[in-house]
Amino acid sequence: METLDLPVERFAAISGPNLSKQIADREPAATVVACADIDNARTIATACTTDYFRAFVTRDVIGLEMCGSLKNVVALAVGMARGAGYGENTAAMIETRGLAELTALGEAAGADPKTFAGLAGVGDLIATCGSPLSRNYTFGSNLGKGLSVEEATKVSNGVAEGVPTADAVVALGKQYGVPTPLATAMSHVLSDGISCAQMLSELFGESISEE
């Protein structure tokens, strides 16, 4: 926006639990359109809505964009745990604590925390963390099976956005004074090659606190 020198009302973002293959197959799904001008958001949502695809609207552009990018780090961690053989309890812990981490970070950046509880947040997280169609989940799964980052990159179908995003989450956390234990642990996986067990050990290394 700053580069193009255009008002924020001219920009919109779309995000949600939208695995592209399932949308192409016309399976029922929904998304969220965010724009500072809610009328513009409604115009775009109307253009996107079909008998199998529903669009909702919000003014929270910051929250929606953060949900769409930061959840990929959580998907990497869940995929890694599943690839290493851990079950639903572990996956649910990572997803839930990851969502709490991202919500706190989003709120510190000026986002509406309710966005993280909606389609763009928890909805997208469920889809991304539970499907082999998700590049980030698949990439993480390959790491959990013992592949290196380089090997996982070679066998992955497309770019796993969570790989470069992990360090960005850690940096944002430092900027806003928000702890990011999950993103920090995944950053160590990607940069130092620590195992899934070590990654989980870092998460459990946190001091006892209220949920």
Identify what each model region corresponds to.
Residues 89-92, 96, 102:
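Ligand/cofactor pocket segment of small-molecule handling proteins
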Residues 45, 95-99, 152-153, 200-201:
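Short, well-structured alpha-helical segments that form the helix of a local strand-helix-strand
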Residues 71, 75-82, 107-117, 121-211:
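NAD(P)-dependent Rossmann-like dehydrogenase/reductase catalytic/cofactor-binding core
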Residues 54-57, 87-91, 106-116:
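Short, structured loop/turn "capping" segments at alpha-beta junctions
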Residues 44, 48, 101-106, 169:
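Hydrophobic alpha-helical packing residues
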Residues 1-87:
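Rossmann-fold dinucleotide-binding core
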